[in-house]
Regions:
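Sec-dependent signal peptide recognition
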Residues: 1-7
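Hydrophobic h-region of N-terminal signal peptides that target proteins for export
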Residues: 8-16
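Noncatalytic, solvent-exposed loop/strand surfaces
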Residues: 15-169
Length: 169
């Protein structure tokens, strides 16, 4: 199993106070962090607030609400898929929720990951999507699974990459 370090989370994590970044490319879906003073250079000693070792492999972006950061992650072989909650200020892992266990993971190209889609936060739920392996809604505070759907089967060719969005209520 490979260790992936969260060295540089999106610019929303650099800001001094927790923000609301609920989906891929932010609250408006346009990637605008609403701050022209954001750093553009990073290193181990420059503009890095924290880093946390996270075993697994994932390309998804983090989402943020109420001082908590949510990410998705998966074993490199695709047999287990998680939602992970981290503390905004310290990077400490608060929750690691096993969302899906798969008997036969679909092929994933080595340049991709089983946890590529970014989660989305709406209200008091965080939605995680792993393509053909399933979609689930978790309670934002407890991490408990509210519902799951595993009936959408398709051949992603290299694995799922599209991030979910919410539409109305």
């Amino acid at each position: 199993m490979r260790i992936i370090f969260l060295l540089l989370l999106p610019v929303v994590l650099i800001q001094a106070k927790p923000t609301y970044w609920n989906q891929f490319r932010g609250p408006n879906g346009d990637g605008d962090a609403q701050n022209s003073q954001l750093p553009i250079q990073f290193s181990e000693s420059k503009n890095l607030t924290w880093k946390t070792p996270i075993p697994g492999k994932a390309w998804s972006s983090p989402v943020v609400k109420d001082g908590k950061v949510w990410i998705t992650n998966a074993e490199e072989d695709g047999y287990k898929m998680w939602a992970i909650q981290l503390d905004w200020k310290t990077g400490e892992q608060i929750k690691k929720v096993l969302v899906f266990k798969n008997k036969e993971p679909q092929f994933c190209h080595p340049m991709n990951s089983y946890a590529t889609p970014t989660p989305v936060i709406e209200g008091e739920m965080v939605f995680v999507h792993f393509g053909t392996h399933g979609t689930a809604a978790l309670d934002l505070k407890s991490g408990m699974k509210i519902w799951e759907r595993r009936d959408f089967k398709c051949d992603h060719f290299r694995v799922a990459a599209a991030s979910p969005i919410t539409h109305k209520e």
